[in-house]
From Swiss-Prot:
Family: Belongs to the universal ribosomal protein uL4 family.
Gene3D superfamilies associated with the record: 3.40.1370.10
SUPFAM superfamilies hit by this protein: Ribosomal protein L4 (SSF52166)
GO MF annotations, alphabetized: rRNA binding; structural constituent of ribosome
Functional note: One of the primary rRNA binding proteins, this protein initially binds near the 5'-end of the 23S rRNA. It is important during the early stages of 50S assembly. It makes multiple contacts with different domains of the 23S rRNA in the assembled 50S subunit and ribosome.
InterPro entries noted in UniProt: Ribosomal_uL4 (IPR002136), Ribosomal_uL4-like (IPR013005), Ribosomal_uL4_dom_sf (IPR023574)
Ribosomal protein listed as a keyword: yes
Name of the protein this chain belongs to: Large ribosomal subunit protein uL4
Record text on subunit structure and interactions: Part of the 50S ribosomal subunit.
GO cellular component: ribonucleoprotein complex; ribosome
Pfam families reported for this sequence: Ribosomal_L4
Amino acid sequence: MELVLKDAQSALTVSETTFGRDFNEALVHQVVVAYAAGARQGTRAQKTRAEVTGSGKKPWRQKGTGRARSGSVKSPIWRSGGVTFAAKPQDHSQKVNKKMYRGALKSILSELVRQDRLIIVEKFSVEAPKTKLLAQKLKDMALEDVLIVTGELDENLFLAARNLYKVDVRDVAGIDPVSLIAFDKVVMTADAVKQVEEMLA
């Protein structure tokens, strides 16, 4: 199949298996959820009534005081007591096979092509690391919410994009399922397309 280069009156021949496959929603959902779960720190911790510092003595006698009965100052009902179902550090990561991960990326890229959200250009760069230059370039292309993927990370482009809202610049090694679906448009250089095909072959 062929994809049109926006900045040149020509087309780029690409692999049908990478950019023209059916959308597997279940697979994409599973991989995206697993990717997001893997980003969780999982370090939160609370103390149960067994771990809270405090006396084991019964605060007051069982009957005769007129107050509600109580057996411990560490009760979850009490202020500064333990937590009933205390959170503990845990690993939230989920296993995703390479075949599944690559399949999800291919599925997302193919859907981007179908929805006209993938824009292929011969090259994408700015003369200097100036936000103003990149902002004007994106305005000329009618792009706002965009992920820019280049073959090799362009330092000028990277620095120029840092202060722009909803604009991100990555090289091919830096793309992932979440970033590809998070932006309204994805701009990819011809060099990046070839690298993606090699990576997902």
